[in-house]
Amino acid sequence: MNYKQPLIVKSQQQALSALRNLKMQTQDTHLNQFFSDDSGRFERFSVEQEQLVLDFSKHRIDQNVLNGLVDLAHAQDLTQWIQRLFSLEEINYTEQRAAMHWALRVPEQNQQVLPEITAQVHTQLERMYSLVEKIHAGQYRGATGEVIQDVVNIGVGGSDLGPLMVTHALSDFKVVTAKPLDVHFVSTMDGSQLSDLLHQLRPETTLFIISSKSFGTIDTLSNAQTVRQWLEKALGKNSHVLKHHFIGVSTKPDKMSEWGIAPENQLLLWDWVGGRYSLWSCIGLPIALTVGVDGFKQLLSGAYAIDQHFQTAPFAQNIPVLIGLLGVWNNNFLDIQTHAVLPYDGRLKYFAAYLQQLEMESNGKSTQRSGEKVDSATCPIVWGEVGPNAQHAFYQLLHQGTHKVSCDFIAPVKRYNANHFTYAENAEALIEQHHLALSNCLAQSRLLAFGNQALTADEIEDLPTYKQYEGNQPSSTILLKELNPYSLGMLIATYEHKVFVQSVLWNINPFDQWGVEKGKEIANQLLPILNREQDDLSTFDASTQGLLKILLGKNNG
């Protein structure tokens, strides 16, 4: 890439004006034309960083657009904002907190970066590692003396989505334990997951992790209370049972103690860790239980590698910055306000759901840091599914619908090796299946970009309109050399920093979530009525009153 930071940085308005002009110049240019105009386009618009490769050549940009986007990043002081992120500054200004999730992956031996905080982090991680090794060795026993063989993580949001996603993604790296060990996840407040799960478990051999930053989330505590009653019914109601069957992860040791969790079973967080950024902390206990201590450390190392890349690489070769800038171009200049995440590997089944929270809870904001309303669109709708399944669900809309959609295609270069084969005779067939997934990944991104031009001349001849493809849907392709703990750490941290880049360009705070809070308060007003502890419906709107009457069996219909 040929971009060099200008000697004179443009103002924000100059950078935006230049990009608007470039939009007018390029908006009618099809991706087919971009590629025919530049035979070196892939080399120009792709970046490799250790185990990650980003191909962004199928975006509707040319070199001038990329230069203009980098100018905008400089005009918005992105360099300074990155420095502010990697500091003690309270950039989460609405909650008066720093945003220091990156500190969770600083290596213990690095004494140059906030040594006191690094020491605190590693004290808790070492406590978690000791617990993991004890469970793996079959030395952690329940109240009756039997070895723990099932661990249930009870959490919601960041205490569930991240650990669930990573645990599933790294299923090939599950460690061998002294006795079989299974990890389960429960999040829904309606009890349906618990109802299904408890029938499969034995109280004597089950350990529960109550994972809640505030230790006040009703979803989590209601599930925790249900399993407590289940345990106490089988094993007796005493502190001995609680001590052997519950681990707590929270910023609130006093609340954990009040609930009954023994101090030695409490793993601590800090207010400067946002829930959706917390899988690197002891919230990641289910991950460590699955992949082992070494696997968890590799996950942290991969994220740390991207932290360093994000802080040091020029913007035009900086993967998180590039992904963020391309999203802004699509969203704010090309008016593409929906983004699909399409991993071509079943192990990344929960990755799109994880990114929905990471991106939409972070950047789904309409108020600037100045307190004024934003004057442009912020976070697009993020959605997705494992690619091969999605091809049979919603790709019809991507190819021939009326909505403009940008996509991220994600795939590992290598899938299977000798360690992954249960039976040697499966090897050839499984590798062929991986190649089938890769061929579909490349084919779909090609067809979305080039439309009819991706077809042969024979196919196009006399092709009815309902079989034609317009193309021109932009996409990135992200290749992992292999899906392993290190590369997954890199991938997740890349998206974390993408979110931050976009928040800077939109001038919003990505680390709070006030839109979530009020609904919980209103639910607390409704619960006493549904529990028949109150009966005054007059303060509610007509719709809510009507629905409450049906739920209470008071309707006259």
UniProtKB/Swiss-Prot annotation:
Disulphide bridges: none
This enzyme's EC code(s): 5.3.1.9
InterPro entries documented for this protein: G6P_Isomerase, G6P_Isomerase_C, Phosphoglucose_isomerase_CS, SIS_dom_sf, SIS_PGI_1, SIS_PGI_2
GO molecular function: carbohydrate derivative binding; glucose-6-phosphate isomerase activity; monosaccharide binding
Swiss-Prot/TrEMBL catalytic activity: alpha-D-glucose 6-phosphate = beta-D-fructose 6-phosphate
GO cellular component annotations of the record: cytosol
Span of the signal peptide: none
Keyword Isomerase included in the entry's annotation: yes
Keyword annotations of the record: Cytoplasm, Gluconeogenesis, Glycolysis, Isomerase
Active-site residue numbers: E361, H392, K520
GO BP field: gluconeogenesis; glucose 6-phosphate metabolic process; glycolytic process
Locations listed in the record: Cytoplasm
Pathways involved: Carbohydrate biosynthesis; gluconeogenesis; Carbohydrate degradation; glycolysis; D-glyceraldehyde 3-phosphate and glycerone phosphate from D-glucose: step 2/4
Pfam families: PGI
Protein family (similarity comment): Belongs to the GPI family.
PANTHER family: GLUCOSE-6-PHOSPHATE ISOMERASE
Record-linked NCBIfam families: PRK00179.1 (NF001211)
Described function: Catalyzes the reversible isomerization of glucose-6-phosphate to fructose-6-phosphate.
Protein name: Glucose-6-phosphate isomerase
Organism: Acinetobacter venetianus (strain ATCC 31012 / DSM 23050 / BCRC 14357 / CCUG 45561 / CIP 110063 / KCTC 2702 / LMG 19082 / RAG-1)
